[in-house]
Every structure is written in C-alpha cells, then in structure tokens.
C-alpha cells in the first residue's frame, strides 16, 4: 500500500455534495390541451436546456427540443398532432421519426432519450399487440406499449461535446458541478511510495492489477477490486 499524499489528505477534509437534478416529466392530460413555453433555462450538471411549459392547471419542466423557443404553443394529449415539441402517444408517431422523453410505462413522464442531443427512433408499430418497437440512443431496440407518450423531436444541446474545454479551469468547474474530482492522477504516473502501480522506467503497471477487497482503502484507485476474472471471455460457456 502506498502512502497518502498531501493532496489526498487535503481532499479527505472536504465533502463532495451529490448532484441534485430536477425531475423532468410532463403531466397526464388525456384531452388535447394547449400550453406555452414560458422560459428555457439551464440546470446545473445537466447538458440539455430545460423548457418550462405552462398549462391550465400546472407547469411542467421537460428537456427542450431542437427548434423550441419561448412563447411557442405546445399541444399535449392522446391525439395531439405531430409537431416539434408536442407531447402525444407514440402510436401516433410515424415510423422512422425521432422522438425523445419516451415513457417506459404510461404516466411516468419520460424515461428514454432525455439527455442533450439524444433521440429514439420509432422502428415499427405492432397493432395486433398494441406495442411499438423503438431504437434508443444506445442502439438497442426496445418494445414499449403504444399507449406510452413521447415528445416529438430531438433533445437540444447536441453540440455540447464538440465544444473544446481549452483550459483546466473549465474542466475543474465542469467536474465540480457534477460532484466529480478533478484532476485525478493515474497510479502509474506516481512514485512507488505513493501508489502500488508507480515507479519503473516507463509507465507500465508490471504487476497484477487485481487486488483483494481487504487491501484497499475507500476511494483509492487501485485497479480491479475483487474481480473473479479479467479480460475477454474465451471459448464457449457451458450451461
């Protein structure tokens, strides 16, 4: 075990607060109702802008779609027309169209494709079983009920990853907003007295990185902790 460096000792005095995100969802309104986008705001630790939509009874916050603007009229309901920002049932959306904030269960307010630049594609509708196949951002195809609702369009803020950080202070505040630690020094870049991966003529671990759970301390970057196996699985697996 390596010794605790000065920077690590200082960091242990501070408590990193967990990030608290506002739950984004839209209400259950069966009949077609008109709302208005009263504001588009930024939330800390969230890449996508948040649109505040005002309806007759209550306001809701949803991920802003590309092309949404302040003062835009939004229609919500089971039979709402297909337009950017409208909230309707997924069975009304044509095949091949991009949607976001897709519900996994009717009434949950949105589960899939809610981060910046993400969207789900409607693959096909199965009318005999009242189900719809969608392709989520990970590339996996899922089957949801055709009664689930969604927002038409692509979530805004897709170009946030194309913007370079340019300097370390920007990366520092980005990590701070998300409750992360920056910078994190690799173990192979340290000296042998500071980390078990340190030392050597060049940066190479040079020893097994799989360690027991008893040999590590909290929040220590040590390698593969208590791993049963490492590497790719070779050969067929017998059941």
Curated annotation (Swiss-Prot):
InterPro entries: NA-bd_OB-fold, Rib_uL2_dom2, Ribosomal_uL2, Ribosomal_uL2_C, Ribosomal_uL2_CS, Ribosomal_uL2_dom3, Translation_prot_SH3-like_sf
Record bears the keyword Transcription: no
One Pfam family this sequence matches: Ribosomal_L2_C
Gene Ontology molecular function: rRNA binding; structural constituent of ribosome
PANTHER family: LARGE RIBOSOMAL SUBUNIT PROTEIN UL2, RIBOSOMAL PROTEIN L2
Assigned protein family: Belongs to the universal ribosomal protein uL2 family.
Full protein name: Large ribosomal subunit protein uL2
Organism: Encephalitozoon cuniculi (strain GB-M1)
């Amino acid at each position: 075990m390596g010794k605790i460096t000065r920077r690590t000792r200082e960091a242990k005095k501070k408590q990193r607060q967990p990030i608290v995100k506002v739950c984004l969802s839209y209400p259950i309104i069966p009949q077609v109702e008109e709302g208005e986008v009263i504001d588009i705001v930024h939330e800390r630790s969230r890449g996508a802008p948040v649109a505040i939509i005002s309806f007759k009874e209550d306001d809701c916050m949803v991920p802003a779609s590309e092309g949404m603007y302040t003062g835009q009229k939004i229609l919500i309901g089971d039979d709402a027309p297909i337009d950017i920002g409208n909230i309707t049932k997924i069975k009304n959306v044509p095949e091949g169209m991009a949607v976001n904030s897709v519900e996994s269960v009717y009434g949950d307010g949105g589960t899939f494709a809610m981060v910046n630049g993400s969207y789900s594609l409607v693959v096909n509708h199965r009318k005999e079983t009242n189900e719809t196949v969608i392709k989520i951002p990970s590339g996996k195809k899922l089957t949801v009920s055709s009664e689930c609702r969604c927002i038409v369009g692509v979530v805004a803020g897709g170009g946030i990853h194309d913007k370079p950080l340019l300097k370390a202070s920007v990366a520092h505040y980005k990590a701070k907003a998300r409750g992360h630690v920056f910078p994190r020094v690799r173990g192979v870049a340290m000296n042998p007295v500071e980390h078990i991966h340190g030392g050597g003529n060049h940066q190479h671990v040079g020893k097994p990185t799989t360690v027991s759970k008893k040999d590590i301390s909290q929040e220590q970057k040590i390698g593969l902790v208590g791993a049963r196996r490492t590497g790719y699985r070779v050969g067929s697996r017998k059941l």
